[in-house]
A protein has these predicted regions:
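Solvent-exposed loop/turn segments at secondary-structure junctions
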Residues: 125-130, 158, 164-169, 202-206, ...
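N-terminal carbohydrate-binding accessory modules
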Residues: 88, 96-158, 173
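Aromatic-rich peripheral "rim/lid" segments of glycoside hydrolase catalytic domains that contact
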Residues: 391-448
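Acidic/histidine-rich helix-loop elements
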Residues: 124-143, 169-172, 211-218, 333-359, ...
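Active-site region of glycoside hydrolase catalytic domains
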Residues: 220-357, 363-386, 406, 413-416
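Ser/Thr-rich, Pro/Gly/Ala-heavy low-complexity intrinsically disordered linkers and tails
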Residues: 1, 5-107
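An active-site-proximal structural segment forming one wall of the substrate-binding cleft
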Residues: 139-159, 169, 173-202, 206-248, ...
Length: 448
């Protein structure tokens, strides 16, 4: 989401719609850290791993019942059981660890194979992307490791971390303390056995040139600034393993031919920026050379993105390492809208689930699935969610459950990764516990 308004816990977009590594240099990673990806991995330790994922000094394992994946995404050795990440010298299936290289840029990443491992995700919304006073400026608590561990214990596999960088930068240099804070949160996520997504979020709208003239046009200044920030972010995270995915933009990239926010889409500038993002990150070394990257759809909108003019960037790392970002808040009158105006032609709806509404959802996800297949790029549904509403527009609980379940199922059956937008309304910021409604939707979703 972009600039946000808090509506009963759902952040509504005004656009519509210090650790250098995963573990300390001497830390022993538990070989069973990713148990649950594909069974129970063998017990034991993988030895001491370098903070940049370089070498394993020969850990041991007592075996186990998993068919693959000792070490999980955290350790210096091992392979992710889903087949998404494969180290060259790691322990697999509870076998003993051995010595030698176990990570770094010699790993192989297959975005499509990662889909199952990424599972069901959530955002830490209205927090590190705050453009006022950062982490707690929008009434959110400080992110704690206990909260992150709680997310993992409740079944979350992916955590998206929206970030405002430019707001707090000085002369184009990202604030060092804020960079370290983001790195700390990412380290907690990966140590808990989950995947992290870090982006440049709305951040005041500079990517879209929202305050420029003409607005919503791509300028050389924007391109230079964008590349500069991704050089800094890429360098800072170069030693963090492939369980970190970098995302170029949020709901930006919505440049138009007439300078209007909702004007005629101008897709070539978005293609150019997606290419700039991929090329810039790949050049920053370490894991960036081959990590999975998430490129932006046009305003992350299905119908505006799934068109011939939208193209997938050329990746210096080869094919199969990119995801496409799409968000889903249809119908917005049910999921987001909080105020009716006089003679409003699109009034708020407090219920969802008619045959027509279900057909719209299925049609859009079918289109998205076809788009993914045609463009040969898997999808991360980086945001979806529905407000609880306030009187007199409180959303019916059964409808909220039905909508969240339908979106999650439509995603899972098509190999799309669903990532909930949450600001503490559905998931406790203390221990990661789910609301009763989200729990029902989560329980009903099974990934193939």
């Amino acid at each position: 989401m972009g600039p946000v308004l808090v509506v009963s816990g759902l952040a509504c977009s005004s656009e519509g719609g210090s650790g250098g590594g995963i573990q300390s240099a001497a830390g022993a990673a538990t070989a069973g850290a990713s148990a649950g990806r594909a069974g129970i991995a063998g017990s034991g330790t993988s030895g001491s791993a370098s903070s940049n994922g370089g070498t394993s000094s020969g850990g041991t394992s007592s075996g186990g019942t998993s068919s693959g994946g000792a070490g999980g995404p955290n350790g210096g050795s091992g392979a992710a059981a889903s087949g998404g990440l494969t180290g060259s010298g790691g322990a697999v299936g509870g076998a003993s660890g051995g010595s030698g290289a176990s990570g770094g840029s010699n790993q192989t990443v297959d975005a499509k194979a990662l889909v199952k491992a990424l599972g069901f995700g959530t955002n830490i919304g209205n927090t590190l992307e705050n453009t006022a006073t950062w982490e707690t400026g929008w009434s959110q608590p400080v992110i704690t490791q206990a909260f992150i561990n709680g997310l993992a214990s409740h079944g979350i596999k992916t955590v998206r971390v929206p970030v405002a960088w430019d707001t707090y930068a000085k002369s184009g240099v990202i604030d060092a303390a804020k960079m370290e804070r983001v790195k700390q949160v990412v380290s907690w996520i990966t140590l808990a056995g989950m995947y992290a997504i870090v982006n440049i979020h709305w951040d005041g709208g500079w990517i879209n040139n929202e305050k420029g003239s003409p607005a919503f046009s791509l300028t050389n200044e924007i391109k230079t600034k964008f590349s500069n920030y991704w050089k800094q972010i890429g360098t800072a995270f170069s030693g963090v393993g492939h369980q970190l995915i970098l995302e170029g933009m949020n709901e930006e990239g919505s440049w138009t031919t007439d300078g209007q926010k909702y004007g005629t889409p101008n897709i070539p500038p978005l293609n150019e920026m997606n290419q700039l993002f991929v090329s810039t990150v790949r050049a920053q070394g370490g894991y960036n050379a081959t990590r999975a990257l998430l490129i932006a759809g046009f305003n992350t909108d299905i119908e505006k993105t799934c068109v011939p003019a939208f193209t997938v960037p050329t990746d210096p790392a080869g094919t199969g390492k990119l995801f496409l970002s799409i968000h889903y808040y249809t119908p917005w009158t049910f999921t987001i809208k909080d105020t009716n105006e006089a003679n409003d032609t699109q009034p708020i709806s407090t219920t969802w689930g008619s045959a027509a509404e279900q057909k719209t959802l299925e049609d859009l996800f079918s289109k998205l699935g076809t788009c993914s297949s045609d463009k040969k790029i898997p999808i991360i549904l980086g945001e979806f969610g529905v407000t609880r509403g306030t009187a007199p527009y409180v959303r019916e609980a059964a409808s909220r459950i039905a909508w969240m379940t339908a979106v999650a199922k439509a995603s899972a059956t098509r190999g799309i990764v669903p990532v909930l937008w949450d600001t503490g309304s559905e998931i406790s910021r203390v221990d990661g516990a789910f609301s009763a409604e989200l729990q029902q939707a989560f329980n009903a979703t099974r990934f193939p």
